[in-house]
C-alpha cells in the first residue's frame, strides 16, 4: 500500500479563536465532514481514526458495501457486555437527571430539548469509523448540524454530535454495521486467539473483530488476561500492546 495524496486541513467552518486556543489539530474535528472537498476524485470514503487498526479485512468490505447501499455506514456503540454508557442520576425516587453523552453535548451546543431528548438514549454513533459515498446526502446534513453545534458548543466532539443528530433526528438513511467493524476497547476488551494471531470478541462464538478502536483509552481493570486458550503459556504476551502516548 502507498499514500497517494496528503492534504492540509483547513477551518472549513469558521470558529472563534477563543475556542481554538492555538490547538490547530482541532481542524480534524471539522475537516472529516468535508472529505469530498479535499479528495474529490473518489466514489467512496472510509474514515478510520489513527487509534484504530484493521484486524480483519472483512470490516473494510462491509464499510464499502454499506455506503454503496445507504447514505452512511457506521456502528452503534452498543453490544453484549459493553459498559453502561447511559448515565442517569436519580433522586426523589422517580425523578432523574439525564447525563448521557449525546444529551449533555446537545444542550451545551444550543440544540433545543426536543432534539436533545430524541438522541439522549439513542445508541451513540462513534464517528471514528464510518463510510459514505461521494454523492451521499449525509455530507450536507452533517455539515449543517456541525455548523449549528459549533455556533455555541465546543469544537471537540461536535462532529460526533452532528452525525448522531443527522441520523436520529434528520433520518439519514444509515446502514448500521456489526460492532466488530468498530470495537471500542474502552467498553469491553477483546480476547486474543493465539492460534490464528487475531483479536476476537470476548463472548461466544468469539467472532473476529474487524477494527479494534482505542477510543477513550482502555477499560482499566487489573490483571486482564486476553488469552483465549489459557493452556498456552506466554510470558507477558501483551505488555505494551495497548500503551497510548
Segment roles from a protein language model:
Residues 1-245:
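Glycosyltransferase catalytic domains, chiefly GT-A lineage
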Amino acid at each position: 500500500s502507498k499514500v497517494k495524496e496528503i492534504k492540509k486541513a483547513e477551518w472549513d467552518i469558521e470558529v472563534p479563536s477563543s475556542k481554538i486556543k492555538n490547538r490547530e489539530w482541532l481542524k480534524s474535528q471539522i475537516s472529516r465532514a468535508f472529505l469530498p472537498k479535499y479528495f474529490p476524485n473518489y466514489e467512496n470514503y472510509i474514515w478510520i481514526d489513527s487509534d484504530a487498526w484493521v484486524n480483519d479485512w472483512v470490516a473494510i468490505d462491509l464499510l464499502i458495501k454499506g455506503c454503496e447501499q445507504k447514505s452512511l455506514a457506521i456502528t452503534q456503540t452498543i453490544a453484549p457486555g459493553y459498559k453502561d454508557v447511559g448515565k442517569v442520576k436519580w433522586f426523589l425516587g422517580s425523578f432523574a437527571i439525564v447525563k448521557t453523552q449525546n444529551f449533555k453535548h446537545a444542550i451545551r451546543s444550543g440544540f433545543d430539548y426536543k432534539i436533545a431528548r430524541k438522541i439522549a438514549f439513542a445508541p451513540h454513533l462513534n464517528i471514528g469509523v464510518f463510510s459514505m459515498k461521494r454523492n451521499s446526502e449525509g455530507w450536507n446534513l452533517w455539515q449543517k448540524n456541525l455548523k449549528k453545534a459549533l455556533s455555541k458548543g465546543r469544537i471537540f466532539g461536535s462532529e460526533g454530535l452532528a452525525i448522531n443528530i443527522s441520523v436520529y433526528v434528520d433520518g439519514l438513511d444509515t446502514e448500521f454495521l456489526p460492532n466488530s467493524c468498530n470495537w471500542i476497547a474502552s467498553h469491553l476488551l477483546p480476547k486474543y486467539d493465539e492460534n490464528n494471531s487475531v483479536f476476537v470478541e470476548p463472548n461466544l462464538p468469539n467472532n473476529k473483530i474487524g477494527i479494534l478502536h482505542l477510543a477513550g483509552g482502555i477499560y482499566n481493570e487489573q490483571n486482564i488476561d486476553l488469552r483465549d486458550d489459557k493452556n498456552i503459556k506466554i510470558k507477558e504476551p501483551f505488555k505494551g500492546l495497548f500503551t497510548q502516548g
